[in-house]
Amino acid sequence: MESRGAADSQDPSAFLSGITGASVTVKLNSGVVYKGELQSIDGYMNIALEKTQEFVNGKLRKSYGDVFVRGNNVLYISAD
């Protein structure tokens, strides 16, 4: 079994707190992707983004100032 380095042992909560204010990609269960600046996230994975772009089937569909995503719709969050 391979051991992990210190960087890999960070818990998800600490990771998400550390990327607040950074550019992120949020993919929803529906396949829609939002790219924007992470403003806040709570224990239910509810997410607030600013300067957000919405992508459907890989194509830019719309740009928003602010977006709120309910946590049960989130498939994953990725730091850009």
Curated annotation (Swiss-Prot):
Keywords: Cytoplasm, mRNA processing, mRNA splicing, Nucleus, Ribonucleoprotein, RNA-binding, rRNA processing, Spliceosome, tRNA processing. It is found in: Cytoplasm; Nucleus. Its main location: cytoplasm. GO terms for biological process: maturation of SSU-rRNA; mRNA splicing, via spliceosome; tRNA processing. Residues 11-80 form the Sm domain. The keyword Metal-binding does not apply. GO terms for cellular component: nucleolus; P-body; sno(s)RNA-containing ribonucleoprotein complex; spliceosomal complex; U4/U6 x U5 tri-snRNP complex; U6 snRNP. The keyword Cytoplasm applies. Pfam families: LSM. SMART domains: Sm (SM00651). GO terms for molecular function: RNA binding. Belongs to the snRNP Sm proteins family. SmF/LSm6 subfamily. Component of the heptameric LSM1-LSM7 complex, which consists of LSM1, LSM2, LSM3, LSM4, LSM5, LSM6 and LSM7. Component of the heptameric LSM2-LSM8 complex, which consists of LSM2, LSM3, LSM4, LSM5, LSM6, LSM7 and LSM8. The LSm subunits form a seven-membered ring structure with a doughnut shape. Component of LSm protein complexes, which are involved in RNA processing and may function in a chaperone-like manner, facilitating the efficient association of RNA processing factors with their substrates. Component of the cytoplasmic LSM1-LSM7 complex, which is thought to be involved in mRNA degradation by activating the decapping step in the 5'-to-3' mRNA decay pathway. Component of the nuclear LSM2-LSM8 complex, which is involved in splicing of nuclear mRNAs. This is U6 snRNA-associated Sm-like protein LSm6. It comes from Coccidioides immitis (strain RS). The gene is LSM6.
